[in-house]
Amino acid sequence: MASPIGKAKSLKFKKDGTFRIMQIADTQDTNITSKNTVEFIGKALDSENPDLVVFTGDQIKGYGLSFATGNRDKKVAEAIRNIVTPVAERNIPFTFVFGNHDDQAFGISKEKQMIVYKSFPTCLAEPGDPSISGYGNHYINILSSDGKKILFNIYLIDSLSASLDGHCSAVSEEQIAWYKSARDYLKDKTGDYVPSLLFQHIPVPEMWNVLKEVP
């Protein structure tokens, strides 16, 4: 069974069996990046000392007016670099998914943004399978400390962008099929289902089914 498109470079558990993931969500900034945000990220990294950082979408706000004029490519790249640099300068591996605001309005394409992210040596994200919905669907194996066994896996799925009517999109059936293919590939390779986490920006619509109205 062949590995589905989107496999990223593997990471390893520490010898003591630990692996710490730090999630950074919705920084929603522009090239005029908040110094407080950048400082906060740096202090959080120093406090938590993660083995992997996962940005879970809306790193930038494509609707930001500072992107409306001038060189958008340059400004968006600057915004991404400002947010990611605290992670990269500490040589911490990181990956990301896109949110509904990253390529909205004055933003640039996800393909162009991926190039900026991939310019950082510690970026693990992959563009993913071009034949399915979304951009950047990928997965990361977490190996045993000796690198011999796949003990854990992280899936990262693009939950797509806002639709023209203003509603948020949802993960597609073909993306779910891709996930199942990767899951089954890992089972075939290891002999059992691999414990996993899945990161995406927009929650699945089914979450509404478990919500209850309260007084």
For the regions a protein language model found, what residue spans apply to each?
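Extended active-site neighborhood of metal-dependent phosphoesterases/phosphodiesterases
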Residues: S3-K9, G70-D192
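Short, glycine/charged-enriched secondary-structure capping and boundary segments
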Residues: N36-V38, A68-G70, K110-Q113, K212-V214
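Active-site-proximal beta-strand elements of phosphoester/diester hydrolases
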Residues: T18-Q28, L151-S161, F199
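N-terminal active-site segment of His-dependent metallophosphoesterases
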Residues: M1-N82
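Active-site neighborhood of phospho(di)ester-bond hydrolases with catalytic His/Asp-centered motifs
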Residues: M22-A25, V53-D58, R90, F94-N100, ...
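Residue-level recognition of the N-termini of beta-strands and the immediately preceding loop/turn
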Residues: F19, L52, G57, I150-I154, ...
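Active-site environment of divalent metal-dependent phosphoester hydrolases
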Residues: T30-I32, K61-G64, F96-I108, A162-D165, ...
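Active-site-proximal segments of metal-dependent phosphoesterases and phosphodiesterases across multiple
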Residues: R72-D73, G191-P215
